[in-house]
Every structure is written in structure tokens, then in C-alpha cells.
């Protein structure tokens, strides 16, 4: 009955507004009692976008482009308490990322070599050799990355539009 009240009181859900940062979905639940977990996961999957084109000013960077590009969406410190590390999470937008590849950090204005890229699942880490459009990877951050930073193939100089904030 309580859920019906929420459905009736809430405005119509609009996925496009979520994707453009104008609406933020709210889920209720408890992992301890397994209440609301399945609707959350189903909703998350429904709202998550596949690798899509992303705006970079007036240009559109298509996920099928051969040139590598990615954006930083999260930075997490102290994931490994023994090493006081800092990981920058990025989503590959286009092309292929290879370990030890040289990339251009647009905001920093310089080339970087990203070694030991990782895929993370909970507390587990796996060093990977390659990643493709749509993949999320973590790289060690010595303090040079910020949320929203653009990385791309050397010779390319574009900046992705900012990540929506609520």
C-alpha cells in the first residue's frame, strides 16, 4: 500500500530527464532484508546507457570511432589501505584502450602513459591488457585527475561535455 502512495504522488518518470541530469531517481530498499533489491537492479539496468555517442562541444564522439577516448567519472582514495592508493575510474567512450598506451590528458595538457589498468569488482582487482567502448577501468591517479576529465588519443584535443550534477 505504501508503494502505491509513492507511485501516485510522484511525477511521471522520464528516462531522458535522468540521462540529461534533470531528474534523479530514488530507490527504497534494504539489502539486509532483501527488500527493494530486485527493483533497484532492474531499474539500474534499464537506466544505464549502452556505449553511446558523447558530446564534446559541437563535435559528437561516436562509440564506434577508432580513436581512443574516455572520461573520468569517479576518484576513490585508500581502496587498498596498505598502499594508500588513489584510483581514477573512467569509462571508455570510443576506440580501444591498451595497457601502457600513451594518451593525452586534455585538462592537464600533456601526454601520459597509463600502466596497470584494472577492472574492479568489490574488493577484487584484475590487471587488464585492453578495454573497449563502454568498459569501465581504473588507473592509478597520482593526483592529476579530476572528475569530468577527458583522455584521448595523442593528436586529438577535445573535451567532453561536463557530467550532469544534481
Where are the regions that the model predicts?
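Structural and coupling elements of P-loop NTPases
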Residues: 1-166
Amino acid at each position: 500500500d505504501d508503494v502505491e502512495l509513492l507511485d501516485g504522488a510522484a511525477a511521471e518518470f522520464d528516462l531522458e530527464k535522468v540521462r540529461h541530469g534533470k531528474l534523479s531517481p530514488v530507490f527504497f530498499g534494504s539489502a539486509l532484508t532483501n527488500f527493494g533489491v530486485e527493483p533497484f537492479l532492474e531499474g539500474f539496468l534499464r537506466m544505464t546507457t549502452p556505449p553511446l555517442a558523447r558530446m564534446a562541444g559541437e563535435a559528437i564522439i561516436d562509440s564506434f570511432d577508432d580513436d581512443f577516448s574516455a572520461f573520468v567519472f569517479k576518484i576513490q582514495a585508500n581502496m587498498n589501505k596498505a598502499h594508500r592508493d588513489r584510483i581514477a575510474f573512467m569509462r571508455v567512450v570510443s576506440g580501444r584502450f591498451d595497457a601502457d598506451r600513451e594518451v593525452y590528458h586534455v585538462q592537464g595538457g600533456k601526454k601520459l602513459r597509463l600502466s596497470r589498468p584494472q577492472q574492479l569488482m568489490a574488493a577484487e582487482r584484475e590487471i587488464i591488457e585492453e578495454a573497449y567502448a563502454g568498459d569501465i577501468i581504473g588507473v592509478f591517479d597520482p593526483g592529476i585527475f579530476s572528475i569530468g576529465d577527458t583522455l584521448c588519443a595523442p593528436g586529438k584535443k577535445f573535451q567532453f561535455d561536463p557530467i550532469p550534477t544534481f
